Amino acid sequence: GLGDVYKRQDLLLAIIKLIEDKMNAEEDINSVGVQVILLVEDSIRFYSSILPHLYKFVLKQSQIFSTEALNQHEQMLRMRGRPKIKLARTYEEAVAIYNKYPNNMLGIVTDVSFKRAGEKDKKAGLKFCSYIREKDEFLPIIIESSEVENQKDAMFLNACFLDKNSKKLPVDLRKTILRNFGFGDFEFINPHTGEVIATVRNLKDLQNTIMSIPDESLYYHGSRNHISRWLYSRAMFPIAELLRQKQFTDISESQEMRQLIFDAIVQYRKMKNRGVVAIFQRERFDKYSNFARIGQGSLGGKGRGLAFIDSMIKRHPILENYEGVSVSIPKTVVLCTDIFDEFMETNNLYQIALSDLPDEDILEYFLKAKLPDKLVDDFMAFFEVVGRPIAVRSSSLLEDSHYQPFAGIYSTYMIPFLEDKDEMLRLLSDAIKGVYASVFYADSKAYMTATSNVIDQEKMAIILQEVVGSQYGDRYYPSFAGVGRSLNYYPINDEKAEDGVVDVAVGLGKYIVDGGRSLRFSPKHPCNVLQTSTLDLALSDTQTRFYALDLKSMGKTFSIDDSFNLLKLSIRDAEKDNSLRGMVSTFDPYDQIIRDGYYEGGRKVVTFANILQHGVFPLAELLKMMLEFGSQEMGRPVEIEFAANLPNQEHKQGMLYWLQIRPIVDTKEMRDDEIGEVRDEDLLLKTDSALGHGIMDNICHVVYVKSDNFRSSNNSLIAREIEKINRMFTERGENYILVGPGRWGSSDTALGIPVKWPHISNSKLIVEMALAGYHIEPSQGTHFFQNLTSFGVGYFTINPSSKGCLFDEESVSYTHLRAHETAANL
C-alpha cells in the first residue's frame, strides 16, 4: 500500500525519478543527446524491486563521473546528463520508445513474458529483441527471465541472460549493466583471447592511451560503438556523437579512427576548458588545461577579469575565426584569497605588515615566512605543464573595481623557467611572498588612505601565468605587447572618442606602463598613425628601447623593485635577435624615406606598418571587436592588456593573448556648464591638448618645477621633494595643480620626473610642459594615467610653440613671492 511506499525511501526516490524522467526525457534527449535505459517489465512487484536498484546504480555512477568535471557547475551539468530510465509494460510501448529514440539507447533490460497485441505473450521479450537486432546489431540487451531455458535464445540474440529466481539478481544486474552499458572503467581487450590490454579510467587516460592500442582491439571496440557508448554514459555528448556518426567497417581504418578519437578528445577538452575556472587537480592539470584555481576564496579583481575574458572568447567564436592566429588567455592558475589569509595568520605577519617599517624590512619578513606546505606538490605539477617563464601577478579584492581604480599599485614579478625545479620552487615562493608584501608597502598604504579604504581589509589572490614570449639567448620577451582602451580622449582627424585607442610596443608591456614611446593608433583607423605621419616624427617619436626578462637572474635576491630581473635594451638588440620582422620599417638615409618592412642595413623604425596597414597580423580587427564586446558586456568603457607572438620557425601560428580587462572608472558625469569667452590675460593655464573633463572647484595651490636652470639629472631628487609636498597636502586635506617639464611618472629620468601616483595623489590637475627643442606626446597608455582619469584628475600638455597653450609662470612666481612676504610680516 501507500504506507509501504513511504517506508521504503529507495522506492519513493525511484517513483519520483521515474516521473521526472518521463517529464524531462524528450527535451534532454533531443537538445543535448542524453541517453535512455529502457526497462521492459509488466510485473509491478518486479519493477518496484528493480527500479530502486537501477536508479541507485545510475545516480552513483553519475556522481562518480561528475568528479571528472572541472568545477561544481560542470559537475552538476554532468549529473543532470545521466541516462534517463524509461519503463514499458507492453511490447507496443517498448517498440514505440525504441523507435522514438533509436540513436539514444544506452541499453535495454527486458523481461520475456508480457503483453503483445493485447494478449499475454510468453515470448514477447524475445520477439522485441529480434526486432532490435534487425536495426542495431550491437546495442546491449539484458534478458531476465524466471525460465532458464530462455538463456539459449538470449545467447542466439547476442544478449546477456539473468535468472529472475536468483537471490543475487540485483547484484548480477548491476555487474552486467556496469560491464555492458558503458559504465565503469573502459577495458580494451584482445578480441581473440579476451585478454585486457589497457584500462582507461577517464578521458585523459583515453587520450594518453589511444595511440598505443593495437589495431585489432581498436577496430573491435570502435566498430561496435563501445567507445562512444562509454562516452555517452559519462555525459560527454559532443565527442560521443562524433564517434557514433563515424562508421568503421574495416580494420585498415584503425589509424584513421585512432587519430579521429585523439583529435576529438583534444578539441572537446579545449572546448570544456574555455570559459571555465576549474578546480586545480594536479593529476589532471595538463597542456590542455587553461584556467584553474587553488583554494576556496575569491579570485581577486584581475582573476575575475581573466575569467571574464575567457568566457567572452567562448561566447564570441568570431574572435577565433582568423586563419593562422590563435586567440586565448595564457595558461593560468590562481591562488585564491584564502591562501593569503592562511599565510598571514600562520606566520603572524599582520603586526609587521601594518607597522611603519620601511618597505625593505617588510619584504624581508615576508620572504622569511613560509607558504602552506600543501602548495608544493601543486606548484611542481604546474611546472611540469608550463615550460615557460612565469608571471606572478597581484589580484587583490579591490583591483579592477568598477568604482575605484587599483591598477599598478601592487608588485608583479617574473621568474625564468629552470630545469632545476627545486630552485624554481624557491623563486616562485619568493615571488608570491613579494606580491603579498607589496600590499603593505608605504605607497600601497598611502593609496588606500587616498581611496578611503582600510588596509587590513584588503585580501590578495595571486595569478600564476605563463609569460607570453619566446627565448632569445639569455633573454625572453613577446613580439609585442600593449594596452587597448575603448575610450579615446585624443581622437585625431576622423577618429571619434568611442573608436578607442591602442598603445603597442615591442617586448614586455612594462615599457608602456613606464611611459615609454609606444605606437598609438585607433583600432578603427589603423592606418591613421600620428607618430609615423612624417619622417621627423617617425624618427624621433617611435620606440627605441624595450624590456625583456633576464633568464640569468635566478640568483638575484628579490627586491621591492619588481623589475629587478628585467633588462631594458635597445631596439638594436632585438634586431640582433631577429625578432623584429613584421613590426619594423627601414629608414633609407640616402633617399630620406622609411620603407615598410625589414631590409638589411638602415635604421629599424618600430612602425608596425606590416601589421596595421598590410594585414600580416589581424591586431586592429581583433582589438576592435574585443573592446566592443568588453564594453557591451561590462556596461562601461574598458581597458584590455594583451601580448602576442608572431609566427616564426618554431611556431607557424601567431598567438594573441589577452592578459587583463578592467573597467575605465569615471565617476564624473558630463556637465553642460558654459565657460564663455575668457581673455588670456585672465588665465593661468591653457592648452589645446587635455585629458579629462568637468569642473574642478576649491583649488588654491600650484606646485610647479621651475623651468629655468632645470636639469633632468635632478629628476629623482625632485620626485622626493614632490612626495613630501604631497604628503603635506594630504594631511591638510587640500588639493593643488602640479606643473613640471617632461612626462610625469616616466621611469626614464631623461623624459620626466619619476613620481608614482601615491606621490601626487592630491593633485587635481597635472600639467606636462614641453622642454625647449623637445616635442612631447601626451602620456596615454599607462596605469598612471588610468588613475588620473579614474580620480577625475585633469591633465594638460603645454607646448610653448603652440598658440593654443599658455602657462603664466611669472604670475605664479609673483604670487609665490607675495605669499612669502605676507608670512614674513606676520
Regions found by a protein language model. Name each.
Residues 33-45, 50-75, 85-87:
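Conserved acidic segment of CheY-like receiver
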Residues 144-293, 311:
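Long, compositionally biased intrinsically disordered regulatory segments in eukaryotic proteins
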Residues 1-4, 41, 106-110, 127-153, ...:
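A short, hydrophobic beta-strand element within the central beta-sheet of small alpha/beta folds
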Residues 2-6, 236, 815-824:
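Conserved small/polar residues in nucleotide/adenosyl-binding loops
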Residues 283-321, 370-770:
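Conserved mixed alpha/beta core segments that line enzyme active sites in large multi-domain catalysts
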Residues 3, 9-25, 53, 172-182:
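Receiver (REC) domain switch/output surface
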Residues 65-107:
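Acidic, metal-coordinating helix/loop segments flanking the phosphotransfer/catalytic sites
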Residues 1, 16, 92-99, 114-138:
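Short amphipathic alpha-helix used as the core "switch/output" element in two-component signaling
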